[in-house]
Amino acid sequence: MAQLTNNDEKYRDLLFEILAHGLITDPEVKRSLAKFFIFVGDGGNGKGTLLSIIRSILNRENCSGLKIKQMSDERYAYSLDGKLVNLGDDIQDQPINGKDMEMLKNISTCDYVEIRKMFKNSTSAAMTTSLIFTSNHILKSWEKGESYKRRVLWLPMYSKPKRKDPRFITKLTTQKALEYWLRLIIEGYKRLYENGDFTN
């Protein structure tokens, strides 16, 4: 985590709060926070590694992997229902259109969205899924208002490891390591409830 945050203690706290955000299933609490998250930076700096670690901590069954453009399709959106987090890796460098932006905002505020299981009629659902994405670029939006800026948390990741370890993820997801991660995430969870906001 020191590598990912450049040894910035407040940034480290923020990252654990973001992971803790995925454990919050109370719509009122999630609505009050009203955020989605985009890790941004060029390749080889650990963005994909972080998503792999999150999947290991929260269990793959609790995670989906939709891109932003897929989410506004009610057939894909169905896969978000009941998940703790959506982990969308390597989002394309294209402006977010109005339809996709509406979906991002609705899910981040636990508003009702339309979802549809294959061969079934669509239905409305309010989801508490946390939305976490990675991108090599700052994504623009067609939206002219301020609500996009209020909803998104940009998380820069520009430092690269000096030496690559092929077993890095395995080492960080042992049972002992996962227990350590979980303890720090719980601390972040408590901070979110106590402060009602993320660490600046």
What do the predicted segments below correspond to?
Residues 1-200:
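Feature primarily recognizes SF3-like P-loop helicase cores of small DNA viruses
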